[in-house]
């Protein structure tokens, strides 16, 4: 093989060792790949991509999380303008259970790179939502034009809905029923900047339930009943969601809340007629 010959003729050829490692990894010769990359990194430790490749191999093929972390952090330290390595490092932090506050602080220390990528921008928004900072997440979503990618379907629309539902729940707890309804109505259709439309079969038991609560708070009993009825629709069998458009298991919980609300109204109506 040409790369093997090149390395044999020049044992200090860092690029040849790196490229040979790429060949071995692509052909599932993982130990050979790691050996080549380690050799390349020893010769030229200033090349970030070889450290990044070693990190992926350590994590995925040797289950060595500590070495994966050390090498990926080294790769990013060598080139902090590489937004892809930043994304991969944040994903590694996520897998290793790094606290939300630390991940968010890390991303916000590198905002120019975060803003280069939709996936990083969505992670930042997700961290805001997970930290209970829903209004800030809502503002960030409105300020960016997103582009769908394979494997990323439903990510930004999910965060768009989540922050509005959570803000609506806060409004309901404060008896601001009209404000809650405005927020929930914003989930009826998605704005163009999300880059994705709403699926025809979207399961929205939670949204319909909270709309029912808002209408009940406003004294509109019939519309509340209509919303609670819509919130009962869907499968009541718990099942794992494999795809983003599958029914999420928590929707069954809101079906139950909606049925309880309807039963309470039936009992109330029966009590009034007796």
Task: Outline where the language-model segments fall.
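Conserved structural position within tetratricopeptide repeats
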Residues: 5-8, 38-42, 73-77, 109-112, ...
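Residue-level recognition of tetratricopeptide repeat
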Residues: 22, 56-57, 91, 126, ...
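Residue-level detector of the short coil/turn that links helix A to helix B
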Residues: 28, 62-63, 97-98, 132, ...
């Amino acid at each position: 093989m040409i790369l093997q010959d090149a390395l044999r003729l020049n044992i200090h050829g860092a690029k040849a060792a790196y490229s040979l490692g790429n060949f071995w990894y692509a052909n599932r010769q993982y130990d050979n790949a790691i050996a080549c990359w380690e050799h390349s990194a020893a010769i030229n430790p200033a090349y970030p991509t070889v450290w990044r490749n070693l990190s992926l191999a350590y994590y995925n093929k040797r289950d060595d999380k500590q070495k994966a972390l050390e090498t990926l952090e080294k790769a990013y330290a060598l080139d902090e303008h590489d937004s892809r390595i930043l994304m991969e490092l944040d994903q590694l932090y996520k897998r290793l259970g790094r606290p939300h506050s630390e991940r968010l602080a890390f991303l916000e220390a590198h905002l120019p790179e975060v803003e280069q990528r939709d996936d990083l921008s969505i992670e930042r928004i997700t961290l805001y939502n997970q930290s209970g900072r829903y209004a800030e997440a809502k503002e960030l979503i409105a300020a960016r034009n997103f582009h769908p990618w394979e494997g990323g379907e439903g990510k930004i629309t999910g965060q768009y809905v989540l922050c509005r539902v959570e803000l609506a729940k806060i409004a309901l707890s404060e008896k601001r029923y009209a404000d809650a309804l405005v927020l929930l109505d914003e989930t009826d259709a998605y704005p163009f900047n999300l880059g994705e439309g709403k699926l025809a079969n979207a399961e929205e038991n939670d949204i319909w339930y909270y709309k029912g609560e808002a209408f009940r708070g406003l004294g509109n009993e019939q519309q509340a009943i209509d919303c609670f009825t819509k919130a009962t629709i869907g499968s009541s069998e718990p099942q794992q969601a494999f795809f983003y458009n599958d029914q999420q298991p928590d929707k069954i919980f809101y079906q139950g809340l909606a049925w309880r609300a309807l039963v309470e109204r039936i009992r109330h109506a029966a009590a009034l007629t007796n």
